[in-house]
Amino acid sequence: MMDSSILQTLAVLYVLYLLGLIIYRLYFSPLAKFPGPKLAACSKWYEFYYDVILRGQFTFQIQRMHQKYGPIVRINPFELHIQDSTFWDELYTKNKEYERYAWMSGRFGANTTTSSTVKSDLHATRRAPLNPMFSKRSITEFEPIVHEKVGLLSKRLAEYAKNGEVLEMNSAFNAFAGDVISSYCFGFSFDQLKSSGFKDNFHAAYEAVRKFAHFGLQFPVVFIILGLSPRAMLKLVVPNIYKMFVLQKDLQSKISAIIQDHQGNPEDIDSKSSLNTHSHPTIFDELLRSKLPPSEKTVRRLGSEAQQMIGAGVETVAWALTTTVFYLLSDHACLDKLRAELKAAIPDPANLPSSTALEKLPYLSACVKEGIRLSTGVSVRLPRVSPHKPIVYGGWVIPPIVPVSMTTLDVLRDPEVFTSPNNFIPERWLGSPKVANTGESLAKYFVPFGKGPRMCIGINLAYVEMHLTLAMLFRRFTFELYETDVSDVEIKHDFMVPQPKLSTKGVRAKVTGLVVE
């Protein structure tokens, strides 16, 4: 047994180490000169408290820090945060060599996906074969499949109109977006739109992982432990996280099948996987035909890519649709304007025009942009690291390697940019919208998809889904909100994407009938 005096000595040394670390971080660190709470400067336990104990509250605590300390604050021992909408382009658009913050890239237990890649050159390599697949032209070629899914959603809503059941909007939109992105990734659909109550979707699994991500950020070893844990135990203890492991295994199996198909037809550039039931090229068929090195085409990496792509392609689109529908159903004046425009543009409600035609409808497009603005996209901060040069903000010189972050929510709800920023006002996007105080284009501050080389690659697909779905909903059906109010869409928690109050039952409505001609 270890001598008690040795234990005491070790305890004293540990305490002295902690004291020395605190003194260094407060007074001698390169970040010591930057304003912010002393507790935050001392330890990451400050962030742990707000995000893990209080459940997704650090984003809002950072906002309170800015109210007290100004536009630049030190939010933990190693990182700075800036709240100044005019600096967004400087941090995310103008400097292509800026990297992601490695510590935050591993918060889901892997950093091999394109979006989580730290180094800018490797990110560019991984993104290059994806860019053509998400171009406007490629998404237009894929659009018939989106029309097909919109039509299936319409049929399901007609069933709800007939039987009078209450519709939970986010579940329906998760199923819709899940079927769309799985069709584009693999060439087949999971058929979530056909499930009872739209309950067979990815939402529960991704939500569980997102809510766990704050803990995983502070203790990344937990993902290793989960990965090594018996699946039967996970199913019993954390059933929704277990669902993610099931999905992960399923995706890797599908990727493996696609790889085998391509290895069997190495010379056929037009070959597609046996999983692909559609005529269009799929994302993973194209990735395997790309010039990426073999190390980038492994089952494990492409499986992680698929997992991330589905999450990004489902959660944000579904929430944007849910938010937009809620505000339209809550504001009869806006809804009446939209219906009038849709009736004039779509004489036959059973025959939707192309998304290109719909995007030319000014009020529909304004509703889409305003709904996306209020839904925010991602709510978590987005750190960047300048590997070689200092970042200059105002009179502050930030040393290289120091992570600097901003938050889309701060820009999209900035009262200096958006009048009445918390209100749904589609009219703000009509004509040539300007910032009232400066005359700048309002579009400059529309950042839910990010900007620059790391902006959301799925922006074109999201716009097609939004325009087609909203046009179908409000040209064909009438709705009535059911036991739902603004608290069911107000952002109260940051779990990577916005989360309303934890007690919410979702945005619910009854499909009351068809639009009267």
Curated annotation (Swiss-Prot):
Specify the pathway. Antibiotic biosynthesis
- Please name the GO terms that the record assigns under molecular function: heme binding; iron ion binding; monooxygenase activity; oxidoreductase activity, acting on paired donors, with incorporation or reduction of molecular oxygen
UniProt keyword annotations, A-Z: Antibiotic biosynthesis, Glycoprotein, Heme, Iron, Membrane, Metal-binding, Monooxygenase, Oxidoreductase, Transmembrane, Transmembrane helix
Entry EC number(s): 1.-.-.-
Q: What does this protein do?
A: Cytochrome P450 monooxygenase; part of the gene cluster that mediates the biosynthesis of sordarin and hypoxysordarin, glycoside antibiotics with a unique tetracyclic diterpene aglycone structure. First, the geranylgeranyl diphosphate synthase sdnC constructs GGDP from farnesyl diphosphate and isopentenyl diphosphate. The diterpene cyclase sdnA then catalyzes the cyclization of GGDP to afford cycloaraneosene.
Protein origin, superkingdom: Eukaryota
Compartment(s) of residence: Membrane
Q: How does it sit in the membrane?
A: Multi-pass membrane protein
Q: Which PANTHER family match?
A: CYTOCHROME P450, N-ACETYLTRYPTOPHAN 6-HYDROXYLASE IVOC-RELATED
Query: GO annotations under biological process?
Result: antibiotic biosynthetic process
Sites where the protein binds heme? C456
Q: What is this protein called?
A: Cytochrome P450 monooxygenase sdnE
Q: Which family does it belong to?
A: Belongs to the cytochrome P450 family.
Q: Main localisation, per the record? A: membrane
Q: Where are the transmembrane segments?
A: 4-24, 219-239
Q: What class of enzyme is it?
A: oxidoreductase
What are the required cofactors? heme
The record lists the lineage as: Eukaryota, Fungi, Dikarya, Ascomycota, Pezizomycotina
According to the record, glycans are attached at: N111
Under the heading Pfam families, the entry gives:
p450
One of the record's GO cellular component terms: membrane
